[in-house]
Every structure is written in structure tokens, then in C-alpha cells.
A protein has these predicted regions:
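Short alpha-helical elements
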Residues: 1-179
Length: 179
């Protein structure tokens, strides 16, 4: 097993700005936010997507906010800028042989689960690694529960950035208190 100081986890969560019924007539962040789909919640939403890079212990290393329609793969390089961790755990949204090859050339090893119908899925999808990957889902749940991150009242980019920075700072300070 790899030492935990070499592993980081990458994932994203939706940041909706309104209820789905208002998706096509909302005016806030016009031209910046757009409509995207969240497969795990089976939900079309208007807003942004927050992509995060987190350590196994839960410390948030980096984050990027994009329009909701931006695919997870397009943000990987920006998230990994300056990352010292060499093993990156992702979900099915990062399953791409091209991305894996590109990251290996940069010195990273990307692990993503295989789809159930892919050859070798049972051997590859080790429950221990899948359990490690759940760390980021726990962090997202904490951000929602403790800081209500999915409900933003920001009405401009400066306000949104300030809110995200405050939430991440508070989360990371809380992380240091616990450890």
C-alpha cells in the first residue's frame, strides 16, 4: 500500500444558484454560470461546479470553480498545479486513457475505477482504494452540513470567491484543530 502522504483525491460538486424550475430564466451570473448535469443527484442545475483536490486526511489542497457544464477532465491540470502528491484518485468522471497518459508524463499516477462492464473491473476496483476515495465525498458532506456551501447568496464573482475562500480556510483550520 502507498504511504498516505503521496495520495490526493480529486472530485467536483455542484454549486446551484437557483431551483431547477428557474434554470432558463435566472439572471444572476449571466454569461458566467450555465446549466450542467449532476449524474449522482440526477439533476440539471444552473450555476457553477466546484472541483477540489483533497488529501487522504481531508485537507483541501486546491480548488477551481467553473461553469456547471465544464467536464471534470478539463480542470485536472489546473487543479494539479504545484501538487507534490504523485497518486491521484478520481471517480468515473476522470476515466480517460489519454488523460492518464498525459498525467504519467507529468509524474502523476491517476487511478479511476473501471465501469462494471469493463474487462478486469472486479480486480481493479479494490474496495480499499474505493474506501479511500470516499474521503472527498465526506469532505463535501461536511462543507454542506457545516458551511452550507451549496447555498450561496453571492451575487458577483468577488463575493463568490470570498465565500469559497472563507469556507475552505475555515475547513482547513478546523482540520488542524482536530489533528
Amino acid at each position: 500500500m502507498l504511504p498516505s502522504n503521496r495520495i490526493a483525491i480529486i472530485d467536483s460538486f455542484p454549486l446551484p444558484l437557483c431551483q431547477p424550475v428557474r434554470n432558463h430564466r435566472v439572471a444572476i451570473f449571466k454569461g458566467l454560470a450555465d446549466i450542467g448535469y449532476n449524474a449522482s443527484k440526477h439533476l440539471w442545475f444552473y450555476g457553477f461546479k466546484v472541483h477540489m483536490l483533497v488529501t487522504l486526511s481531508g485537507y483541501i489542497l486546491n480548488y477551481v470553480v467553473t461553469p456547471a457544464s465544464v467536464h471534470d477532465i478539463k480542470v485536472v491540470y489546473e487543479l494539479l498545479e504545484g501538487c507534490k502528491r504523485s497518486v491521484i484518485l478520481g471517480d468515473l468522471g476522470y476515466l480517460s486513457s489519454e488523460l492518464k497518459k498525459d498525467l504519467e508524463q507529468l509524474g502523476y499516477h491517476l487511478w479511476t475505477p473501471f465501469r462494471q462492464n469493463m474487462a478486469g473491473a472486479e480486480e481493479h476496483n479494490d474496495w480499499k482504494v474505493m474506501a479511500m476515495r470516499r474521503t472527498i465525498e465526506t469532505r463535501f458532506s461536511e462543507l454542506c452540513r457545516l458551511f452550507d456551501v451549496e447555498h450561496t447568496l453571492a451575487r458577483n464573482l468577488a463575493g463568490l470567491q470570498l465565500r469559497m475562500e472563507q469556507i475552505i480556510l475555515a475547513h482547513n483550520l478546523r482540520y488542524f484543530e482536530m489533528n
